[in-house]
């Protein structure tokens, strides 16, 4: 195929994309560049320009990048503590990762993020400070993927106008998404990561189409504060850590911030087998190991060791929410 035909196909793609963007000039230009680079990557990999344009069809964006960002969300009950618990160099950030068979192609991952966000509009937001509480505000902007350069779960700058409560990173064959816990919990984060990787694989041509749940329109229930609907079932958290004195552990806190990185390799099958032999769940077995480790790290014979464990309330209260919806057990 001639260079002129390739350029013509690319021009049609970018023209169609431009009609679906109502962004500031700089961000519009960056997003057009994202799609151009993704198309060039696909054609370099041997894909015909017409098929590359079909995979990157801007119609899949819907009107997401044309919308007016006039919606805001109060924090759900579980999320209110996270802004208040932030300190210099620490905030409640968690990470989920997926490992691919080959190295990540950044151009396609960036395009995959653009296609994934319309399915998760609650994630296209920023954190704002209100008179009494923080809240989450919708934004219409370009979100960017980046190479991984920092320690996992580093604090996020949520103070600026271009801030966001999640980030997408890549390193070799790993795709990682980190979330400020104010935005979502493990269930919502896993749904987002699964959709993102699925979209990436579709762009690569490894799968023909994405699952129906991702293609469907966002469900309003996904952004609900489920605690309000199930207040009676969730009840009140019990007791916290107040009461008897706690055991003091030996040693000093590590200086690495936000965390020291330790890697453990476990055989999931063997772990489940060990739990069954003790008539316990995997969670209960690991908590028992942690309790024994805490005892071993203490010189004191008296005092309580209590561990608070988040429980996914979706197992007990039927909700599709992608926001934080745990209760804690101890």
For each feature predicted by the language model, list its residue ranges.
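Acyl-thioester-dependent acyl-group transfer interface
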Residues: 1-134, 140-167, 178, 263, ...
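Non-catalytic, low-complexity flexible loops and terminal extensions
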Residues: 2, 28-53, 174, 183-191, ...
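Structural preference for long, well-ordered alpha-helical segments in enzyme cores
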Residues: 105-119, 189-199, 271, 282-294
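Hydrophobic/aromatic-lined pockets within catalytic cores
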Residues: 121, 184, 197-204, 276-279, ...
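Conserved catalytic-core segments centered on acid/base and nucleophilic motifs
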Residues: 175-177, 182-183, 271-285, 293
């Amino acid at each position: 195929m001639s260079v002129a035909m390739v350029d013509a196909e690319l021009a049609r793609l970018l023209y169609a994309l431009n009609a679906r963007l109502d962004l500031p000039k700089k961000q519009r230009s960056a997003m057009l560049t994202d799609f151009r680079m993704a198309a060039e990557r696909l054609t370099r990999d041997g894909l015909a320009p017409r098929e590359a344009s079909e995979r990157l069809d801007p119609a899949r964006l819907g009107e997401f990048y044309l919308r007016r960002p006039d919606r805001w969300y109060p924090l759900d009950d579980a999320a209110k503590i996270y802004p208040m618990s932030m300190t210099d160099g620490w905030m409640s950030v968690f990470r989920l990762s997926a490992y691919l068979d080959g190295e990540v192609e950044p151009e396609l991952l960036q395009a995959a993020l653009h296609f994934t966000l319309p399915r998760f509009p609650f994630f296209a937001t920023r954190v704002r400070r209100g008179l009494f509480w923080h809240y989450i505000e919708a934004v219409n902007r370009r979100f960017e993927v980046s190479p991984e350069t920092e320690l996992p779960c580093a604090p996020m700058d949520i103070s600026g106008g271009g801030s966001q409560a999640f980030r997408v990173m890549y390193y070799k064959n790993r795709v990682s998404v980190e979330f400020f816990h104010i935005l979502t919990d493990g269930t919502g984060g896993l749904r987002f990561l699964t959709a993102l990787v699925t979209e990436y694989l579709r762009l690569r041509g490894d799968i023909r189409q994405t699952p129906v749940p991702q293609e469907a329109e966002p469900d309003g229930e996904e952004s609900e504060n489920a605690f309000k609907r199930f207040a009676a079932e969730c009840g009140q958290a019990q007791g916290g850590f107040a009461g008897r004195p706690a055991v003091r552990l030996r040693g000093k806190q590590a200086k690495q911030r936000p965390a020291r990185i330790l890697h453990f390799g476990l055989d999931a099958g063997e772990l489940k087998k060990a739990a069954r032999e003790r008539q316990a769940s995997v969670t209960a077995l690991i908590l028992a190991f942690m309790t024994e480790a805490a005892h071993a790290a203490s010189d004191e014979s008296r005092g309580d060791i209590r561990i608070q464990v988040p429980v996914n309330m979706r197992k007990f209260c039927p909700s599709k929410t992608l926001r934080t919806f745990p209760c804690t057990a101890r």
